[in-house]
Amino acid sequence: MVEPNLIFYDTETTGTDINFSQIIQCGSVLTDAQLNIEDEQNIGSSPLPWVIPHPKAMLTNKKINSFKSNTSHYQMIKEIYDQWQSWSTNQPSIFVTYNGHRFDEELIRRQFWYNLFEPYVTNTNQNGRLDLMLMMHNIASFFYDKFTIPNFEDGPALSLKLEHICLVHGLSLIHI
């Protein structure tokens, strides 16, 4: 059996409500099963004219410069779709997010659909999906003695924030 490629991705959006948000940036990295980076894509666009960005989203993602982008939303979505298709057509791929199934994944699907692209790229044609945060919940519950999960603000609660997990394991988290 062929080992699947891994496609890690994250989006930045104009809002916090999936029904009123637009993707303004998407970063994707293609790796082999041993996590060797084979290709990457980082693309953004300006907000659509009728989308009003939510201040909380703009404070979180700090993508104010996207307002000056000459890339249209359609062009960005088409390039994401084309890239993901090219990465996953000849070899099955697993699309990996961190806390992305409820928001990023659904928003990607909706925006593929709005722009007349097949919305289910991430789970058809032998492709699959993985939300690492859901996996971290299982690890924290059942394998807490095998993998260090940091505490939240030195309290009894655990922190599953990606930056906290990376910090405790000596991994760098690059924000673009």
Stretch-by-stretch model annotation:
Residues 89-91, 115-123, 145-152:
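Short helix-coil transition/hinge motifs at the ends and kinks of transmembrane helices
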Residues 103-127:
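Substrate-recognition/cap helix-loop segment adjacent to the acidic, metal-dependent catalytic center
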Residues 153-170:
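A structural motif
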Residues 2-111, 164-167:
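Conserved non-catalytic scaffold segment of RNase H-like nuclease domains
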